[in-house]
Amino acid sequence: MRKALLFVVLCMFITGCDWFREKPEIATVLAKHFDNKLYNKFDTAIYLPIFKAKLEDQSKGFLNPKLISAFYAKNEYLPKLITKFYVTGQLDTLKSFVAQSKADGFNPEIFNATAYEKQLQALNRNQFKTIDEVYEAIADLELNTAYILNKYTNFMGYGSINPRNFFNRFYIKVLRPDSLKMDSVLNTENLVAELKKVQPTNRPYIELKKALANYRDSIGNEETPQVNAIKMNLERMRWRLPLQTEELVVVNIPDFTLTWFKQDDTLAHMNVCVGGKREATYVQKMKRYLKTGRLDDKPKNHETPQLFSVFNAIQVNPIWNIPVSIAKSEIYWMARKDPYYLSN
């Protein structure tokens, strides 16, 4: 009985010793990098509740909170991004890309630029007095890295908005990042490669970036019509079309022009007719029209739809007849009201 009791006590003593606790990878990486034994005290049992509480609190501001939460749940809530990318300097590269996003028309603060720089500096200084300070710093830096990486690659690679949710008559099925794509970015083994992959490289985009820099230097004011117009067009160029082709016919609706491109060459350029902006009170008038059914209440909407399609054939100088829908809903009704409408 005494031997059995001694064996149980001995087992409990051995299990409770730090000597036999498995050291987390983050402890090994940071202790070696900074030559500081403090990081060897890193205890995941203490760190995990701190990280989970911060994740729950900060995820409300994430672009894709469910995706990031699932990523950490799969990785046992460990600081995977810091472990993989801090020592190699790739987190500093991420900070640099975020700072340079101003050249693409973004405000770097939408990516928490200032806070991220301070968090990196705190770890770089390596002046923690207790391991508890390390837990707080690692948790904040890890979560901000995930937030920035997810948001930056989405915004730079696909645009900051989905135009189909923004424009009234936008029928282009622009490519958008799905959960598999975003998860692959968080699980990457080469963070810098992911950042480079989402940079727009087409010539018009590069030329617009140069124009933005020139206007900023010459005007010295960020909030001008010229600067804002360039920013909006940079955003439009980040929207990914469903198909990339060597030849492209582009209708510039505000400019009333059509241009036929073949790669960087212009094959044709001409003026075209486009629709006008719909009435300012369109929504209210449409509600009234749906109730009354009277054509007098129907609001005018002649906006040119934004669409993308592939030409199978082109007919030059076609015979154009008034579409039946226009004849019924507009011309017939106006002719009944005004006997001289057609002659005028």
What is the predicted role of each segment?
Residues 18-65, 143, 150-151, 155, ...:
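Well-ordered beta-sheet/strand-loop patches within structured domains
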Residues 2-8:
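Sec-dependent signal peptide recognition
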Residues 13-16:
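C-terminal motif of bacterial Sec signal peptides marking the signal peptidase cleavage site
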Residues 9, 130-137, 174-181, 190-191:
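Alpha-helix capping and helix-coil boundary motifs
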Residues 18-170:
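Cationic-aromatic interfacial patches
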